[in-house]
Amino acid sequence: MSREALIERQTTETNIRLKVALDGSGTWQGSSGIPFFDHLLAQMARHGLLDLKVWAEGDLEVDNHHTVEDIGICLGQAVKKALGDKKGISRYGSALVPMDEALVLVALDFSGRPYLAWGLELPPGRIGSLETELVEEFLRAMVNNSGLTLHVRQLAGHNAHHLAEALFKALGRAIRQAVTLDPREQGIPSTKGILS
């Protein structure tokens, strides 16, 4: 069973082609046009053992918002499509990741009910050319389009780069845990018999 998906999205603001393989080796290819955002996506892919390819063109001359948000939309849709009916998945995942002074906790559930509980205090400003406020926008778009319940908590830290990187590493590890197929689970991991 191949658990991968390709999503294409074209608007007047962006043109995005995104491919994800859930049972990958952690490879990243492509470009969003925003180097630090690419770095974060590469960290998520590597630590999630996801193969992620992103080709994006956006109206970066306006700002980065449309591109970052639309990549979140595409990633959410791709993960949802790749999971199919979610039969046999572990469903839940969590990770606690340090990076120097920063410590970030991510807990998630592929419940089919989108919800983002945001508990990260990224200082206003930019990391490279990425506005820190767009990290939350990316996650909200991903959550809303994947049906994911996601909790993010900052337990320590103040450096925006370290916090963002710890977050994306933790997100990758939690996704990896949640999408892993459990050989003992023959059906949908829910007493309802459905995750939607």
Curated annotation (Swiss-Prot):
InterPro entries linked to this entry: IGPD_sf (IPR038494), ImidazoleglycerolP_deHydtase (IPR000807), ImidazoleglycerP_deHydtase_CS (IPR020565), Ribosomal_Su5_D2-typ_SF (IPR020568)
Domain of life from the UniProt record: Bacteria
Pathway: Amino-acid biosynthesis; L-histidine biosynthesis; L-histidine from 5-phospho-alpha-D-ribose 1-diphosphate: step 6/9
GO CC entries: cytoplasm
Compartment(s) where it occurs, according to its Swiss-Prot or TrEMBL record: Cytoplasm
One example of a Gene Ontology biological process annotation: L-histidine biosynthetic process
Keywords: Amino-acid biosynthesis, Cytoplasm, Histidine biosynthesis, Lyase
Pfam families in the record: IGPD (PF00475)
SUPFAM superfamilies, per database record: Ribosomal protein S5 domain 2-like (SSF54211)
Record field: catalytic activity: D-erythro-1-(imidazol-4-yl)glycerol 3-phosphate = 3-(imidazol-4-yl)-2-oxopropyl phosphate + H2O
Class of this enzyme: lyase
Gene3D superfamilies the record matches: Imidazole glycerol phosphate dehydratase, domain 1 (3.30.230.40)
Gene Ontology MF terms: imidazoleglycerol-phosphate dehydratase activity
EC number(s) stated in the UniProt entry for this protein: 4.2.1.19
Entries under PROSITE patterns matching the protein: IGP_DEHYDRATASE_1, IGP_DEHYDRATASE_2
Family: Belongs to the imidazoleglycerol-phosphate dehydratase family.
Cited PANTHER family: IMIDAZOLEGLYCEROL-PHOSPHATE DEHYDRATASE, IMIDAZOLEGLYCEROL-PHOSPHATE DEHYDRATASE HIS7
UniProt name for this protein: Imidazoleglycerol-phosphate dehydratase
Organism: Moorella thermoacetica (strain ATCC 39073 / JCM 9320)
Highest classification ranks of the organism: Bacteria, Bacillati, Bacillota, Clostridia, Moorellales
